Amino acid sequence: MTPKRALISLTSYHGPFYKDGAKTGVFVVEILRSFDTFEKHGFEVDFVSETGGFGWDEHYLPKSFIGGEDKMNFETKNSAFNKALARIKTANEVNASDYKVFFASAGHGALFDYPKAKNLQDIASKIYANGGVIAAICHGPLLFDGLIDIKTTRPLIEGKAITGFPLEGEIALGVDDILRSRKLTTVERVANKNGAKYLAPIHPWDDYSITDGKLVTGVNANSSYSTTIRAINALYS
């Protein structure tokens, strides 16, 4: 029997972002929880980024942000999570036909590279065209900017409902002015630009995720589990 396989994308950007000079990059909690959930449901999981590189968002490292099983999986060198991470691929090394689910993780680093990550977008569109699922969490839906449905040649999210990290959350984190000064976009703007309907959570830190056919989106790291479960369920619906 062919194993079920999921591909989790990471942002390649790792550079200064915050007012204190700290770097942004991958939000580790999102990939820890999505990886663990896929594995517990029988999936083989690989990681990919546009360039094959990545770095952690320094404001959300495990020592101050997570504990329990997440912390153990991150800190144990030979954990399944770290073994998979050590095998991270560049986007042009990936064969889309090997995977049934594409899961776009985020962190503020995604603001910089996802909208122009053409190779990641190509993988996602091919998985979707083959009957697979595209899922994205937090800032992950920025990958949808310019992502084309191969069958219709229209924006893949056109006419669909999506969610993602809201502007209200950026304001609460004190980074909305950084987005403006660096001309970085938001999930809601990407939705509007590509003909999708953006559904906001009641509060930016709520566990909130939605499914629209084979397209699944979640708001934040607190939504990692529910978004992953929705992606798995969407695959078999």
UniProtKB/Swiss-Prot annotation:
Catalyzes the conversion of methylglyoxal (MG) to D-lactate in a single glutathione (GSH)-independent step. May play a role in detoxifying endogenously produced glyoxals. Involved in protection against reactive oxygen species (ROS). Important for viability in stationary phase. May negatively regulate TORC1 in response to nutrient limitation. The keyword Ribosomal protein does not apply. It is an enzyme of class 4 (lyase). It catalyses: methylglyoxal + H2O = (R)-lactate + H(+). It comes from Saccharomyces cerevisiae (strain ATCC 204508 / S288c). This is Probable glutathione-independent glyoxalase HSP33. The active site is at residues 138-139, 170. Its EC number is 4.2.1.130.
